[in-house]
Amino acid sequence: SESVSRITAGIGQVLGRRGYQMLLANTDNVAERELEYLDLFQNHPVDGIVLVATMITDEHRAAIASCRVPIVLIGQNVEGAACVYHDDYEAAYELGHALVGRVEGKIAYIGVTEEDRAAGYDRRRGFEAGLLAAGVVLDPHLVRRGSFTLDSGYRAARELLADVPDVSFIACATDTMAAGALRALDEA
């Protein structure tokens, strides 16, 4: 995704200025691969691990707790671990609250699995709470789920538009899925 690309570029720049090299492993959001790489990197001569994870499972927590090298998690808040993250709930709350009064009609939401605490659970709950604080309830029939990809945003928006052609606004959990939804809207 664009955000992960920017994160890794920034980390690479800082590490390079300090004389470090970065080894990068792409896991495609597959939890088992993340765990395999955590094990691989901590058992080889690395100075630290930066993990951009979507879902933190019990296995992740155990691997993080037993890691023998410093580890920093990006994008998730895990108790007892060094983490860099933003407030997904509040950001989505502000979006939901700001929409009411600016958008007339049906407001929809395309999210991701709620196993991802930040992008899935917190963003959806924040969006719903922001709408509710302004007096609007998010209709469950106007909620779809994607999988972080442009194509999944496209498919979810197409499905939504087929079911509810008069939807006025579609909020998406990620920029990448929003790009797919925009493509579907452009074709509608």
Predicted regions and their residues:
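Short, glycine/serine-rich, charged loops/turns that create anion-binding
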Residues: 1, 29, 56, 78, ...
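Bacterial carbohydrate/catabolite-sensing allosteric modules
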Residues: 10-20, 42, 65-73, 77-188
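Amphipathic helical "hinge" segments at domain boundaries
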Residues: 1-48, 125, 129
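Acidic, Gly/Pro-rich loop/turn segments at junctions of secondary structure
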Residues: 51-58, 76-81
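Short beta->alpha connector loops
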Residues: 28-31, 52-57, 176
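Short, flexible loop segments at the rims of nucleotide/cofactor-binding pockets, characterized by
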Residues: 25-29, 48-51, 84-87, 148
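Short acidic active-site motifs
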Residues: 33-37, 59-60, 152, 156
